[in-house]
Each structure stands twice: as structure tokens, then as C-alpha cells.
Amino acid sequence: MSNTFSKNNVKKIKQISLSLATNEDVLSWSNGVVSKPETINYKTYKPEKDGLFDEIIFGPVTDFKCPICFTKYKKSDENTICKRTTSCEKIQPKILPKISRRSRMGHIALNNPVVHFWFFKINHSTISKLLGLKVAGSNKPVTKSDLEKIIYYKSHIVLETGGLKSLQKNTIIDINDAADIYAGALEEILEFNKDNKDGYEEILDTLNDLKEYAASKTGQDYGIDFYEYNEIIEEYSQAKIGTGSKAIEYLLKNIDLEKESKEIQDEIDTINDQNKYEISSSEALKRNKLYKRLAIIKSFLKSGQKPENLLIYNLPVIPADLRPLVQLDGGRHSTSDINELYRRIIIRNNRLEKWYESDAPVLIKQNEFRMLQEAVDALIDNSRKKPGPVTSKDGHPFKSISDALVGKKGRFRQNLLGKRVDYSGRSVIVVGPHLKMYQVGIPRDMAAKLFEPWIINRIMKEEEGINSVKAAKKLVDSLNPIIWPYVEQVLENRPVLLNRAPTLHRLSIQAFQPVLIRGKAIKIHPLVTTAFNADFDGDQMAVHVPISKAAVREAQELMLASKNILGPKDGEPIINPSQDIILGLYYLTIEKANQKNEGKFYPSFNEMMLAYENKYINLATRVVLPVSALKKISILQKTDAPYIYSTVGKFILNNAFPRDFDFVFGKRVTEKLTSTNEHGEEVVSLKTKIDTSEHDIKRYVFNYGDNFTAKIKEADVNLPLNKKEIAKIVRNIYEKYVPIVNIEDISQVINKIDKTQLDNLHELCSELKDFNGNKLEDNRIHLELLVRLIKEEFLKIQDQYFAKDEESIFNHKYWELKHYTKLLERVWFRYSNYVSTVLDVIKDLGFKFSTKSGITISMNDIVTSKTTKERIKKAEEETEALKDYFKKGYLTDDERYTLTIKKWSDVKESIEKELKKVVDSNLDNPLFMMLSSGARGTYSNFTQLAGMRGLMNNNTKILKADAENDRVVRSIVEIPVKSSFLDGLTAYEFYSSTHGARKGLTDTALNTAKSGYLTRRLVEVAQGVVIREEDCGSDYGFVVKDIKDTKTNTIIESLQERIEGRFTAVPIYDQNGKLIVKESELITPEIASEIVAKGITKVEIRSVLSCHTRNGLCKKCYGKDLATNRIVNIGEAVGVIAAQSIGEPGTQLTMRTFHTGGVAGGEDITGGFGRLIELIDAYDQPWGTPAEISRHYGKVKKIETQKNKKGKESGQFNISVEYFDEDGNKQTHQYLVKSSQRLRVKQGDEVVAGQKLSEGPIVLNELLESVDTRAVQNYILKEVQKLYRLQGIAIADKYIEIIIRQMLSKISIIDPGDSSFYSGSLVDAFVYQKENGILLSQGKKPAYGVVKIKGAKQTPLLSDSWLAAASYQETAKILVDASIAKRTDNLEGLKENIIIGYKIPAGTNSNFEENGKYNLKEFSSYFPNKYDSTPELKLEEITDENIEEEFDYLKENTISEEEFENLDDDTMYHLETSDEFEDESFGEDDFEYSEE
């Protein structure tokens, strides 16, 4: 489907291609030659004729003014020619607006061609690879630096030998070797010219001069002068020796690309044939060089461009307003650096012309050629220029054209991908506990400024006596009290977007309904802070106003905070109560035995509340109420008993929940488990569950005649609800009340309503279907909810518009379109925000009771354990004993250090366990309440308060060498801090702990920056991955099982978690052959539990890794969208979400920390952020010693210690693996492993290809050589999951799969066959498959290639889109490659479209489904047949013609600056729409709340 809001018949750019500019191109762009280095006249400030700012070339400085006779024309005269004076007739200046100075170009006619700097400097010199010069007769290549010497006129090159044996073609003649080469050449020429008397003498004289000069001191010190000898050689023979750009031009014009291409391909084939099985590094290097040459030659052949276009004959001059000259106060001027660089070129070019005219010596001209070449180089790319960039007087390097493109501040990232936004403000945030979840408090003055145009519109419509924009604006600017009612009206149904930097994931920008508040700070709902990662210690947030209708609808439907309950990374609610709210709810649900008036009966809820308010009972008292008094459907459905008991607090909590939500009875201990640990101590662990009316009602109800008090005394005391339980309840609320009926269906019910129809509303609603196609009559909760909402809103509208008084002017006889629209709008808003309404009630309860509880903490609340001091004393004795052992030589120092650290870690652990018991036995203690409720603090914090602080970090730098050589790195101080904060630290202990504290802060800061960069790289990798179709039809699944840590044999991620929310690839049967789930079915949580319960350990699912959709994914391979808990919609930008989900928690991954200070090596090193980068960037040398992997399927024959030649042990193991080769013969492969590495195999073990033989990280490229891509994908997936899960961060597999799919999406061509590919090229897997499919169908030979793994750093650079690649990194290199290949960008990804200012091809601008979440229509469009008494211009009727007419009218009624100066105030308001009148006060810099 296409979007209702999209503009029709707008001319769209379909693709953008980049090629080399030919000489003709430059002349066709140009409007004249810039021949003078002047800019503007220092007296008149007018641009100089033929200078860099000439008005005739670049356009007028004033709108529609002739640059010669200064006549002012009207807009209607645009593009005509002025003929007022004779000069005008001669020059024929065009009448143009001043904006043309941003687009009109000029050129400088260079007096000598110049080689384009990028093409011999970037990417190891395109020109060098293209020419691939070799010295004739020998195999010596001409290097890149040799070529540069020619370009800068330092050396000469033999272009033609003319039959002279002493000259070899393509030989570079260096100034030091010139004497011998020229002497040989002259002697040969002398032989040929024996008969030519005059010539013979001239040549002989020259030869003698040369020998004499070469032998002299000057000749030996400075080398000889080439030029006169060149002239003689060229005069008397066919030889040709050249230098500089002319020599390069000659070479480029005479290269035969077809012939070169064929020769290179033959050479590559020869290398491949000779090295079928293994290739030496020198041969591989040679082949690589040939691949690169072939790529460039093929680029020129395919694009049909001429190699000589790499030279510049006419240098384009960019438009004048893009390199402005700005007047500063005090008559000074500031100019763009580019003007200075152009001036140097013009000055040198003009001087060269003078040398030509005065017939100067060659040497002088040659020097000028070189200076001209260097000047053009500086203009193109000053920062890369060697020996150093051109600098200004104060020594700063000039910014050249390239510098304006690259980097964060370059054109791409600063102006094209990120722009400053008008209608925005920012301020500090404070908490707004009274707000609804979809509301935000906006300061009044900020709102007045943000919504100024709308407010002015309202005031002019409705306020008497104000009929000019100027007057209305004055009211708004002065914040006149008259405006506030209008501000309120404007804010209705106009959401604003809130953003908190850093924007790590999509929930960092959400929409809210603004509410006006006094003060200067923005008020934020407390529950959305988690999503923004905000707190109220001075954070700031930015506000943006969506302007168009489409933007407003998107904000309301897709971005409203109350609809973004689930976090996209794991599908768990991100709107979880915390801190105060948790403490309040914990306090509210405390249950105690033997309270005053326990077991008392109250006939109603209100009576119970009265007793509570009069302090007869407290919140923890267990009391009895009649079941009927609770009006809870969820209880009435489950029991016939008349009475129910719970605590007062829980009755209050459940009363706040909806009537059909389960009654929550609290947390019950189901069993106590006791076990003994390794120290022989008894450990008690509790198993608990939340009791609800769904399953456990029988425990909590009484029958007639029961003794309430006695029965309650016997009952167990339930535990209060902590953070985890409340999170479960929130999840439950979400699942129960999230909308399941779409707006289209609700509108059909409303369509049938009129005054009489309300009676059968129940029947109409029960016919509705949910998203699974089931009728609503099966889902009572939603049926009742919809009926209630429609009824309530219907009656409100009746009361508002249909007055009881028949004569009333407000009395509408019939329902019209606006009434239906309003009803749908209100019902849909309440229905889709119902979850947030319930959560708001929970929030209010939490705050209320945390206030009422009056919980405070003091020093006396810190309870200590009596055994702490004894444990520390015992540990001190044991560490002393270790020192003794070391002195006696039983231990090495490293072993002693490691054991000491282990001892202190154990002591701290035992103290923590002891204190945990203390906490569990004192649950009334306010400090422990905070701890056990999960409101704040952890057991480890409390251990530091009451037990001991423990071991501290040291400032040892951990080096890669330590990891590789398995040194014990002493990154922990071995003397711990033995005091707790309660005791107070000694001076030494305080000093010792400062380092660790600072390290923590610096690590976090560094980590945040690295994590941000990682997210950026991942987004670049996956930005184009969007859900494009329903089903790609892939029959190739992905087999998943539990992800286990093979070392500890613990499950990292269970099968159930991995398959839930995915589609099956094949039918799944249990052991008895009974079908559990069909093929291509969604695995729901229930099905997933059933599969695991039936003992199935492997499941084949549809996966991102085997999806056949090009440039995206299909719904079946992706599965469930975690943020909505539904099957994903077409148009969802899953690539970006995947990147955000992996990058956002990146900050929480620890840096490389050594946990127990244990032995460096093994698992310690491979944790954390560094390892994640290693995997995602596919490092060839990971940290530590890489694992040795088996290359074959075979058996470990023997493992022995390797000995050197002298028979001594060399410190390595030799593992012999026996396997069968392709011909079935037995072979043995030897693997060498360091003896310090732990082995993972033993003698006699069967091994498979890719299996680890020793501990350590696997090098991905090595793994890919020995196994298929599936195994590599599995390995990366497992490793990344391991990193996150060990830190307690859950991320869905599918996100990591998307990144892996992109990393393995390129194929390196080895044999091109009959395809259009060439050897060594990297092509996209989809392109490769398509091309091969076509070749096979035509009976031709297909191409053969191998999959290559590319890290996240390189993947974006290999993108099909050159715009996306150039805006990422290495801009110049990408543009060079794209231009020689004449690459075309089809604008398929998100980034390319942002760059050229189009909507991204995702979301509401994609090909979405009819009833998908992106099909956003105006509410009124759901009622096409309803009567509308207010005819307006409908959206479809606003065509481009209408808009054009409007603009033409505005432009014609525009006046000149001079007339403008003489206007009086009364005339001013007519100008408000004119494009000449630029209202300064709304400019970006003056905007009071503008971004940054």
C-alpha cells in the first residue's frame, strides 16, 4: 500500500551516478573564465571583473540587478538579457536572482594540464595501478613514488625508445643516473648520424660537454640538466623522453585497456593453476596486486570513460556563495580558505602565461608547472599534501575542498545526514508525578515560542481588532496574558517529540501530549525515565514540534510514550516502576501476623478504609471482606465462596487494578531448600510464587460459619512484592490490555451507531475479530472494555452537541461526520492507551504509600555481623602462612599472589553471605526494606557498609604481551581494605581505594564513547535492512539448540528463549510422531514450552541468516517484532533496531577487567567490550593466544611435547590429527600449540572441522577456511550472546543474526567464468546468485567465488550505495572508486534517501499491508459516507498546481529592498508572506530554546 499523505506527481530522482568530469563537462558548467586573482574592490566592496567573485560569471549580488549598468529589474524579467548600454549589449549579462550565486560556476583555463591529486595519491594511486608500468626488458615495476617524481618534474621517463638500445621503454631516469643513460643514447645516435655532417658535429659537441660536465664537481653534486640533451635526442632520433603531466597524458592516451585486461587475467589464471591447494605469501601478494589493477582497468572498460579524464585542463571554480567573503566590523574581511587556494592557482597560472609569452628557459617554465600542480593539489586536498599542507600566515593549514567533505564536521555528516531543526527548544527536566504517561509539562513561554505560527493564526481568526501578523506576533513575543487560551487550543491534539541525548535507541525519542506549566523546566513522567535513561540531576531534553498532518499522525500512533511499553531489545516492559514507587508498593503489600484487630470482617471496601483511616487496623492487618463487595469479575468467575481475606494494603492495591484483572494475594513461600556449601555451612534457599485469583483462590476464601480469626492465624504470612514481582505484574497488565482489535474494525462499529443503536452495541462488538482472526466474544476483557468506552464517549458527545432543549442553537438533529470522527478519535485514544492508564494508577499508589510510610535511614540501621572480625583475623593468619611458604621456596611469588587474592575474595564472599542472613531476619529495618524491595542498593553495597570493603584495583596496565605469555598481571592490590564504611577507613585504606574509584569513572567515560562509535558502525552495517515482503519462500532453515558454555557446561541461552516468536522451517513432531506445530507457523510461548517439555533438543526455524529477500528481510524469516509482541510489519526498519539493541547495552559491558585477579589467560581475557569489538570487526589477531582449530574431520592420533634440534623441550605440544583426504587416503596433520595453553582434546578423541584443540578465541577467517558459513554464523552468535548474557543483558538472537548476515554478505570471485565479474572482485551474495542463475539457464559457465567475512568497519564501505559508503568513512577513496567505475546509486537504503532529502523507504513510506501499523489514515477517512456540513478543501484536492499558483501569487507581489526601506508601519503587514521579508527573530541563532 502507498501512503495517503504522499504527494502525487512530484518528479523523483530515481538514481544518482558519479563519473569523471570531462573537459567538455567543465566548460558546459562554466559561465566564464576567472583570470584575475582579485576578489572585491577594497574601496567600493564591489566584486572585481574577471575575479573570483565576478558578478557576470557567478551572478548578481543584488536580486535582478544588471552587474554592468546596475539597472534593477522585476522578478518577471528573470533570465532575460540586459541591453541598456553598449557595454551591456556587448557582454550580454543575464538578469538573475542573487541565489544564483550559490549554483553558477566558473573555470580557470590552465596553461598546462594538471594531474588530479586524488587519482595519484589516494588508495595507493589509481594512475599507478592503471598504467602498471614496468621497465621494458626487465620485470622491474615502476612504483607509485617513482610516478610522483615524474608528476612533480623531478625525474624523466622514456616514452618511446626510437630503436635506441641504451633506452628502455618506461624507464624512469633519475637525475643521478642521467649522465650514463644519456651518454649511451648520444653515442648510439652518433653512430646513426655519421653521414649527416652538421648533425654529427652538434651531437659530438653535446656528448663531450656531457662527459666533461658529468665529471666535474657540480655535475657530481647536483646531477646533470636534462633538457638540452632531450632536445638533441628528439631532434636526431625517434626517441621520446618526457616529464610532468604531459608525460602522464601521453601514457594515459596510449594505454590499450583491453590488451592489459587480458594479460592480467592470464597472469592470475597462471598463478591460480600453479597454486591450487596452497599459495605462498609472495604469490598471494602478487595476485592481490593483479586483482587491484584488474579492478581499475575493468572499471574504465565498463564505464567507457577515457583515462585522460584523470587530468585537469580547465579547473572548475565553485559558486561564489559557497566560499563567501564576509565583511566584519571595522572594515576587515574574513574569507573562506578556498578563495586563498584559488588565488594561488590563478597567480601561478598567469605567471606561467607570461613565461610562455616571453619564451623563458625550459627550467623556469618547468618550475612553474610544478608550482601550478602543487597549487591545484592544495585546493583539492590540502591535508594529504606532502611534504606538508599549505598554511596561512598564522600557520594553520587551509581547509581544502576534500576537508569540507570528510569527518564529523564535513558536508555529509554535518549538513546532509544531520540538520538543525527549527521549532525546537531545550530545557532542564524535572519530575512530574501527577502527569499521565502520554503527557509532558512544557513551560508556558517555551510553548508560546514553539507554536508561534499556529497561535498567531488563532489570534487573527478570533481576537477582535487584531488583523495583522505583526500585531499578533507582538502579543506572543511579549507573552501578553491574552494569548494563553489560544495556546491551550493550539496544543490540543498536537503532540511534541522529546529527545534526550545520547540517542542510543529508538525510545530516546518519544511523543507526548503537551500540558502547559509555569516555570522554566520541562516536566517528565517518572515511568518513562528508564527508556530515556534520564534522571533529574540536571539532565536536559530537547523538544521538537511535528508540523505536517502526516508527522502528527505518526507521532500520535507510533511514537506516543504510552504505546511504547516494551523495549525492542528483549521484548520486556521498559516502563517498569522503580525506586520510590517500588518502595511504596512493597510497604503497601507487607503482611504481618498477630496485628491488632486481625481477622475482623468489614461489609464493604469503604468501611474497611474508614477503619484504616481511624487507625483501627493498619496496612499489614489481614481482614475479611465479602466477595461481592470487591466487584472483581476475576474472583467471581473462580469461586462461589462468600468471603475473602487479604491485608488492607493488598485490598487497596487490587482495588486500583481493573475489575477483570486477577486479584494479587502476594508472594508465598512454596518450599524451603537447605543445602551445605563447600565450607560445610548450611544454606537455606526459598522457592516462592505469586498467588493470584487465577490459580490460588481456594487458600484465601472462607465459607459461611467459618471462624475467620482462627483460620487466619493458621495461615502462612505472605511476603511483600518486590521489584521483580511488580515487573511480572506489569508484563501481565500489558499482555491483558494491549489493543487486539484494529482501528479499522472499531470504526465499522461506530459507523453503525446513531441515537438508537446503542442497545445492540454488545452484539456489534462481539462480531469483531482480533489480530489472530478470533471473534471478540471469546475475549470478554476486550469486549467489555470496548463496549464501555464506546458507550461513555458516545454519551459525552450526546451531552455536548445534542442539547435536551429542542430550541437550542447547539442542537444537532443528526450525527455528522465530525461527531463520528470525534467519537472514533476518543475511543481509539482511550483503548490504545489503556495499559498506560493502569500503570499510572500503580505509579500514584506507589508514590502515595512511599510518602505515607515515612521510611528514613540512619547510622543505627546498619546492622553488623559478629563474625566479620574473626573471619578477617583468620584470613590474615593464612596469608602470613602463604608468605612463609614462599620464603621457604614451596611457592613461586606468582602462586603466592594468586592464592592471597583468592583467599581475600573468599573471605569477602563469606561475609556477604553472613550479612545476607542478617538482612533476611530484620525485614522491618528501613535500610533492608530498600534493599529487599529492589528500590535501591545491592547486597554488595551493604557488605561495604557493614562488613569489609575488600580488594581494590591497582593501576597496572594489562598488555597484550601479558595475555599472550600468560603472565600473572597484578591488577589487584593484595592487601584488601579490611574496614567497612561504618568503621571508617584508615589513611592507607582510603588511599588504596581512591584508585579503584577513579578507574571506575574513567572506564565508564571511555566505554560510553566506544559504545557510541560501535552503535554508529552497526547502524551503518545494517541500515538498509527493512522488512520488505510477506514470505521469501526460503526452504533452508537454521537449526537451533541451547547455547551452552562448553567449558563450564552451563546453559547461556535456552532453546525455549531462542525459538519463541520465530517461524518453523519444518513441521515439528514429538517422539511418538505426533505433530506439535506445522511448517511456517509462529512458535508462541505456549508452543515453545510444549516443545521443550516433550524433550526436543533441536528445532529448525526460519532465520534471518537464510532469508532470500534482497536488500531486506521477509516477515516469516524475522518472526515476531519484540516491541509490539506481534508478527513484524512490512516496512519495519529492523536493521537499525538490531544495531541499536546491540549497541545500546554496550556501555554496560565491562571493559577488559580481570575478575579474581587470577591467572591471566583463559576465559578472563575474552570477556567484555573488547571481545565484542573483536568479533564484530572480525579481527585477525584477537587478544591473547588464539585457539588452534582442527582443519579436518578426523581423530587425535597422539599428543606429544615438541622437542628442538638439541632434543630439549621447546615449550610446545604437537597434536597429530589423522584424516582421510578427497581420494580416501589417510593423511596426518600436525598442529603446534603452546604448552601454556589448555588443551580441549585428548588422545583418541574424534574431532570435527572447526573444533577447538586448545583454549582461546578463534580467528574467524581461519574458521571460515575450514568450515561452512553456518558454523561461523553459529560461532559468532554464541560468542556475542555469551558476552551479553554473562552481564545479565538479554538480547534477541535475530538482532545478532542481522549483523552476522551483513558481515557474510560478500563473495570474492576466484574464477569469473562467463559472468560480468572479474577475478578478485567482491560482489554481493544476491548479485552473485542472480548472475549465476542466468548463466546456468543459458548453459554458460557460472562464476566461482568464496564467501568472505568482513568486519563492521569494512562492511559499510562495500555497500552497493556509494552515497552511504562515502558518508561513513574514507570518503575520498570511495568517491575515487565510484567515479572511475561510473557507479550508480539506486537509493535503496535509508541513508541515501536522507542525504538527498527524501523520506526513507521504511515505515509509513514503505509498501505496507492494508491493516499494518503503518497504515495511518485521517480519522475522518474511516467514514466516507457520512454527511459533512463543513466542506473543506480535501487533502487529495491539494495538487501541486494549487501550490504553484499560491507561490506565483506570492512572488509577483514582492517588492524591492529600496521600496521596503521607505514603507510605513501600516503597509508592513501585507509583506508577511513575501519571501523578501525575512523575519530575523525566528532565526536559528536567536531562537531562545534552540538546539545547543
Swiss-Prot record:
Gene3D superfamilies xrefs: 1.10.132.30, 1.10.150.390, 1.10.1790.20, 1.10.40.90, 2.40.40.20, 2.40.50.100, RNA polymerase II, clamp domain (4.10.860.120), RNA polymerase Rpb1, domain 3 (1.10.274.100)
Positions with a binding annotation for Mg(2+): D535, D537, D539
Record's function text: DNA-dependent RNA polymerase catalyzes the transcription of DNA into RNA using the four ribonucleoside triphosphates as substrates.
Family assignment from sequence similarity: Belongs to the RNA polymerase beta' chain family.
Primary gene name: rpoC
UniProt GO cellular component terms: DNA-directed RNA polymerase complex
Keyword Glycosyltransferase attributed: no
Class of this enzyme: transferase
Catalytic reaction list: RNA(n) + a ribonucleoside 5'-triphosphate = RNA(n+1) + diphosphate
Protein name: DNA-directed RNA polymerase subunit beta'
The enzyme's E.C. designation: 2.7.7.6
UniProt-annotated stretches for the region Disordered: 1473-1492
A GO term for molecular function: DNA binding
Biased composition (Acidic residues): 1474-1492
The record's free-text note on cofactor binding: Binds 1 Mg(2+) ion per subunit. Binds 1 Zn(2+) ion per subunit; 2 are expected compared to other organisms.
